[in-house]
A protein has these predicted regions:
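Phosphate-group recognition and catalysis centered on beta-loop-alpha active-site segments
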Residues: 1-216
Length: 216
């Protein structure tokens, strides 16, 4: 997030207090299989440590400072810290399988939407958790992103706002997909969201909530 240390419990609580419709977070597997909440695959940018998450145990990750004294959280802690619906982005099939276990154990189908840049990860979580809402995320894409989303059973496409065109929006609508734009942090980007009549947008700044429907 833009106002709190990103992907920390502090940031998620702030997003909930700001009244966001949905909180987006990113999941990675630690060396010992914990679902760790962090955007990057490495800890370097957002903590005082270095190296890949996948090469560190949960205990090692817990020892890091994620900003303002915050610790790297696991997914279950976020579930307990906020009541806001969540969108959990997974990076691969292995994470899909780990997340599926948590979703079944805690009956999260109605509360958690699952997204990924990886088609096979979306397909896997759809297979493992019947009824789960899924989204295919894309940064560099063409109209084929709509066909890819339909093929893996996604209900939503989350698309880089800088590359979004009316042609893609119309194709997505014709295919029955919802469309979320990211990352929307400026008034110009907000105007584009409204002009294209998107279903929502992802932002780093919860205060922008007063001007539209947003996730953080």
């Amino acid at each position: 997030m833009g106002v709190e240390p990103e992907n920390t419990l502090r940031s998620f609580v702030a997003a909930q207090q700001a009244g966001l419709d949905l909180i987006e977070l990113d999941l990675h597997l630690s060396k010992d299989g914990a679902l760790v909440v962090m955007h990057d695959a490495e800890v370097d940018r957002t903590t005082d440590g270095s190296g890949p998450i996948a090469e560190k145990t949960l205990a090692e990750l817990r020892a890091l400072d994620a900003g303002r004294g915050e610790r790297v959280p696991v997914f279950e802690e976020v579930l307990d810290a906020v009541d806001t619906p969540l969108q959990a982005e997974i990076k691969d099939v292995a994470a899909a399988r780990a997340l599926a276990e948590v979703m079944h154990a805690r009956d999260l189908t109605a509360r958690v939407e699952v997204s990924s840049f990886q088609d096979d990860a979306v397909a896997e979580i759809t297979r493992l958790v019947p009824g789960v809402r899924t989204a295919l995320v894309a940064s560099r894409y063409g109209t084929d992103v709509v066909d890819r989303a339909v093929a893996v059973g996604a209900a939503t496409v989350c698309l880089n706002i800088r590359r979004l065109t009316l042609e893609i929006v119309e194709h997505a609508r014709a295919s029955g997909l919802r469309i979320i734009g990211w990352v929307v942090n400026t008034q110009d980007q907000l105007r584009l969201v409204r002009a294209l009549e998107l279903d929502g947008a992802t932002t780093d700044y919860p205060e922008i909530k007063r001007t539209g429907r947003f996730t953080a």
